[in-house]
């Protein structure tokens, strides 16, 4: 397994295919994955397992029974960023370099409802958006996660991942 400074947090994910695809992305970029219950599926859902391919034994995945449990069981020195279309910060404006020594947690809401208003208010200064063309309402959850992970890898000179594939 690996140790990572970046954490992807899915708040009550609803679509198994998205979660499976996010497992693959987290594995590819060596990111930790946190799932906050309740889910809209079972973890053994065949659609999720298929979308995760052969990454299930490689991903660092943590389950949390609630938001409160997540806060209690993760390190106190963490930066929590919420992904939302109304965010004022873009991923490139966040210092994601691993020498920052701070654990980064990027929280993604439900596919149909987003994040609860209470969280949006609590973290109003830590909201991130992926810039997209205005007529488009949103992009797929797993694509949004991939955008954040790519920026993380870019800021860290891709961790020599490209050289490992040559």
From Swiss-Prot:
Report a single Gene Ontology molecular function. Answer: tRNA (cytidine(34)-2'-O)-methyltransferase activity
Is tRNA processing among this UniProt entry's keywords?
yes
Report the SUPFAM superfamilies cross-referenced here. Answer: alpha/beta knot
Entry keyword Methyltransferase: yes
Q: Which reaction does it catalyse?
A: cytidine(34) in tRNA + S-adenosyl-L-methionine = 2'-O-methylcytidine(34) in tRNA + S-adenosyl-L-homocysteine + H(+); 5-carboxymethylaminomethyluridine(34) in tRNA(Leu) + S-adenosyl-L-methionine = 5-carboxymethylaminomethyl-2'-O-methyluridine(34) in tRNA(Leu) + S-adenosyl-L-homocysteine + H(+)
- EC annotation from Swiss-Prot or TrEMBL: 2.1.1.207
Record-listed S-adenosyl-L-methionine binding positions: 83, 109, 130, 138
Keywords, alphabetical: Cytoplasm, Methyltransferase, S-adenosyl-L-methionine, Transferase, tRNA processing
CDD domains, sorted? SpoU-like_TrmL
Compartments it resides in: Cytoplasm
What GO biological process terms are annotated to this protein in UniProt? wobble position ribose methylation
InterPro entries in alphabetical order: Alpha/beta_knot_MTases, SpoU_MeTrfase, TrmL, tRNA_m1G_MTases_N
Summarizing the function annotation, the protein's role is:
Could methylate the ribose at the nucleotide 34 wobble position in tRNA.
Recorded hits in NCBIfam families, A to Z, give: tRNA_yibK_trmL
Q: Which family does it belong to?
A: Belongs to the class IV-like SAM-binding methyltransferase superfamily. RNA methyltransferase TrmH family. TrmL subfamily.
Q: What is this protein called?
A: Putative tRNA (cytidine(34)-2'-O)-methyltransferase
């Amino acid at each position: 397994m690996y140790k990572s400074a970046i954490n992807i947090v899915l708040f009550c994910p609803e679509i198994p295919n998205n979660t499976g695809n996010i497992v693959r992305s987290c594995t590819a970029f060596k990111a930790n994955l946190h799932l906050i219950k309740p889910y809209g599926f079972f973890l053994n859902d065949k659609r999720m397992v298929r979308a995760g391919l052969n990454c299930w034994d490689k991903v660092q995945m943590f389950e949390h029974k609630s938001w409160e449990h997540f806060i209690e069981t993760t390190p106190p020195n963490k930066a929590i960023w919420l992904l939302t279309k109304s965010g004022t910060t873009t991923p490139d404006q966040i210092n994601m370099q691993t020498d920052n020594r701070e654990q980064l947690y990027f929280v993604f809401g439900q596919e149909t409802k987003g994040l609860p208003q209470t969280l949006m208010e609590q973290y109003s200064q830590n909201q991130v958006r992926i810039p997209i063309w205005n007529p488009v309402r949103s992009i797929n959850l797993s694509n949004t996660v991939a955008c954040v992970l790519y920026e993380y890898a870019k800021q860290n000179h891709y961790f020599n991942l490209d050289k490992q594939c040559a």
